[in-house]
């Protein structure tokens, strides 16, 4: 299939041949859910920690004698039912990350791209050239090509030797724009693509993805 390439003004300047699989795959919502859940789990720091009764300082002495006071028996001031006591079933640092099979990741990526393409919110632009990084230029470009009701944009970029220093200048120009998420074509995440109102590719980024999918 052929995908239309747009310039900075949103006008068509050519086409790019890509495999149908990228934008014409069946959308698997269950797989998208699993892939996004995996990405969010892998991001978790898992540093949460509270103290058990064994770890709370103090509480070694019996607060009062066992019998004769009329009060409930108590063996420690650090019991979980006491104020200042330890926690029961306390959270401890743990690793939430887990591995998702490569084939599932691949199908989830094709699903989200096909979903966005089918909803007509995916656009491909020719590669940008810069004399110097310019956020103002890219912010103006985004506001010009973005649909009125769209807010979040996922911008997929790809590095190539032929671009020279333009790749780094593009990153510097885009990274401070509000509601824009940069995505690397070499390691694409499902989460930012799925939750973006619009998805933009540079021509190089789509070419790299096409080569990867073709194998």
From Swiss-Prot:
Region (Disordered) residue spans: 43-97
Transmembrane segments: none
Superkingdom assignment: Bacteria
Matching InterPro entries: Ribosomal_uL4, Ribosomal_uL4-like, Ribosomal_uL4_dom_sf
Gene3D superfamilies documented for this protein: 3.40.1370.10
Keyword Ribosomal protein: yes
GO biological process, any: translation
The keyword Plastid is annotated on this UniProt entry: no
Molecular function terms from GO: rRNA binding; structural constituent of ribosome
GO CC annotation terms, alphabetical: ribonucleoprotein complex; ribosome
Keywords on record: Ribonucleoprotein, Ribosomal protein, RNA-binding, rRNA-binding
Family, per entry: Belongs to the universal ribosomal protein uL4 family.
Function: One of the primary rRNA binding proteins, this protein initially binds near the 5'-end of the 23S rRNA. It is important during the early stages of 50S assembly. It makes multiple contacts with different domains of the 23S rRNA in the assembled 50S subunit and ribosome.
Subunit text: Part of the 50S ribosomal subunit.
HAMAP family xref list: Ribosomal_uL4_B
Protein name: Large ribosomal subunit protein uL4
Organism for this UniProt entry: Brachyspira pilosicoli
